[in-house]
Amino acid sequence: MGMPMSNKVLLYTRTVARMKPSMVVARLQRTKSVSEAPVDVSLRPLGIACGALDADAAYAARFDLDALARDEFLLINETQKVDLTRWEAPEASHLWNFNLHYFEYCVPLAARYAAGGSREDLDLFKRLTLTWMAACKYPRGDAWHPYTISLRLVNWLVCLNLFGDVLVDDGDFMCAMTASMYRQYRHLLANQERHLLANH
């Protein structure tokens, strides 16, 4: 059962009373949409992978890489089966679903591939990103929240770097991925979280 309306009014009143006027104005502004724009897919991804961090065993242990192939994701110490046609786990918490859109679990997958992993790691990464692009329609849901975008873009760039030329040589995939990343970046630029006045 939800919170009574009188409690909601009090909650919002107390919250707004502590905010700076610029924060209130920024929060009241609607999400700004950006149109699709052409992007030069011949550009090579930036080299931002850091092996000491991205291939760290303790970092990788936070995720069950083998379960990803079954569409099961271990995030914040909880495993959920995800419907990749919707890219959400309805029974999971909002925080868990937010974490789903970070794609952090793909960094150790790409690191495993770079260390001599199998073609299945590459195919799984491609399947996850392509199903995400198909399911997460612009600009709806947690997928398009500025915070999830800011983390996902970095994680995708790290993965592209770790997978290397084998992805760059897949023109169709790189075209789709680069176009998606560019749109996410433009959306992030247009929808910065000015109402927070801080980094997360």
Report each predicted region and the residues it spans.
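Aromatic-lined, polymer-binding surfaces characteristic
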Residues: H94-H200
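Active-site substrate-recognition loop segments, prototypically the cytochrome P450 B′-helix/B-C loop
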Residues: L84, E88
